[in-house]
Amino acid sequence: MSVMLETSLGDLIIDLEVDKCPRTCENFIKLCKLKYYALNAFFNVSKNFIAQSGDPTATGTGGESLASYVYSQSPSGPRPPRYFTPEILNSLKHTHKGTLSMAVAPINPPGCGSQFFITLADNIDYLDGKHAVFGHVIEGLDTLDKINDAFTDKEGRPLQNIRIRHVEILEDPFPDPDNFMPIPQSPIRPPDDLSKVRIADTEDPNAVIPEEEAEELRRRTEAASSALTLEMIGDLPFAAVRPPENILFVCKLNPVTQDEDLELIFSRFGKILSCEVVRDKKSGDSLQYAFIEFDEREAAEQAYFKMQNVLVDDRRIWVDFSQSVAKMNRSMLSSSNPTGRGGRGGRGGRGGNYSGRRDGDRDRDRDSGWSSRRDAPDSRRPPPPPVPMSSSRDVGGTEGYGLVFDDRSAPSSRGSKRDRERSPKRERDRERERDRSPRRDRDRERDRSPRRDRDRERDDHDRRDRDRNGRDRERNGDRERYRERSRERENERYRERDDRDRRR
């Protein structure tokens, strides 16, 4: 006896164990005959495990037996129980892929309603003895593979609905009960969780989209995911960041072109805030590209259209809008974390501003009582030299317009070391060292007197003599032992020769 389930992904032909499980098979066949399973969704799909259906509400808590469903449609007589007792046999196990079982409700005694599942892998012995096996899929294993590969949410529900569109009974060996209801003409889709929007089983998301639009959609998705990744690792302030529209990127420059030359040429389009040619950090040679920041976006647009492929110092330059957000990222980090607490710009961060970190430490030290000592000028120590700002000819070129991974504004390890050396404990130790008494200096000078040096040299000389004499004695002892062994071997040879002569 067989039943065919027509799903949205293909057909499944199931052979039922009518002889071994008559009660379970009759309940399943009669529900199929009443079109109870029509348009039901597979609401629980676990990869390489099971695909569950048979619940009109698609929640896992609905469904009922044949007797309960018939009574709900035409009440007459006493109300039957919602579940029936299935046949759970040890001879029927979940050994092969495509095994059909009734889902047993965790009640006492265990019972089944209308929910069933199909195994998606072999040898799932965990389910043996817990659920009632009553059939096997004999055709349509490729359909099970499609169900197994479906994308699901965190609850196991496929993102695109997989539904049972129609059920065809190939053979029904059981007669209809006396109170059997009339067979409906056209099934109505049950209201299964209308609160969540899902892709319909008949819908193809890419069917009506042209190839160009589908490619554009794919590129936008990849760009959004890449931006989100850069935001997570800290290279972008936020995923939806856009590069500034008033900054131009100029490349293919002549190595002899200077900042002043470009600024003079581009200044006719509007006010220029900065014009910097990026240079090599070691040699100072031009890298043949520059960044020009205008006061207004309209001026940058005019320069973009008018200066494209213009001859500058015998070179055809290329002008485009800058795609770097490094300057924007640094300014946002410094504004959102001015005191240096945590983050990339804080004490232990990877980037940030050294002066801002020192100001934050000074504020905390002022609260704890250390600011007067640290901030007070020291007459014995000259003030530190001012830190020069990087110019267009400095190492690495410009400070404002680097690549996304540019991190030149981060403080060096020497700066962090200087900051640690300015801690109150180290300052206290330095004061103690500077204020130590002259008596200790005199004692140290006395320890280095010529007499003590002569005594120390004499002791070292005696120690070396003793070591040399000990080594000589050891060497002489080794020689004596070698001579004794040689004499013994010589005497042994003489005795052997005398014995041979006597025997002759």
Swiss-Prot record:
Record-linked InterPro entries: CRIP, Cyclophilin-like_dom_sf, Cyclophilin-type_PPIase_dom, Cyclophilin_PPIL4, Nucleotide-bd_a/b_plait_sf, RBD_domain_sf, RRM_dom
Residue ranges occupied by any RRM domain in the UniProt entry: 246-324
Biased composition (Gly residues): 340-354
Residue intervals of the PPIase cyclophilin-type domain: 1-169
Catalysed reactions listed for this entry: [protein]-peptidylproline (omega=180) = [protein]-peptidylproline (omega=0)
Biased composition (Basic and acidic residues): 356-381, 416-504
Cellular localization per UniProt: Nucleus
GO CC terms of this entry: nucleus
SUPFAM superfamilies xrefs: Cyclophilin-like, RNA-binding domain, RBD
This protein's UniProt keywords: Isomerase, Nucleus, RNA-binding, Rotamase
Biased composition (Polar residues): 330-339
Enzyme class per UniProt: isomerase
GO molecular function ontology, one term from the record: RNA binding
Pfam families according to UniProt: Pro_isomerase (PF00160), RRM_1 (PF00076)
Family under the similarity heading: Belongs to the cyclophilin-type PPIase family. PPIL4 subfamily.
Name of the protein in question: Peptidyl-prolyl cis-trans isomerase-like 4
Organism lineage: Eukaryota, Fungi, Dikarya, Basidiomycota, Agaricomycotina
Gene expressing this chain: CYP6
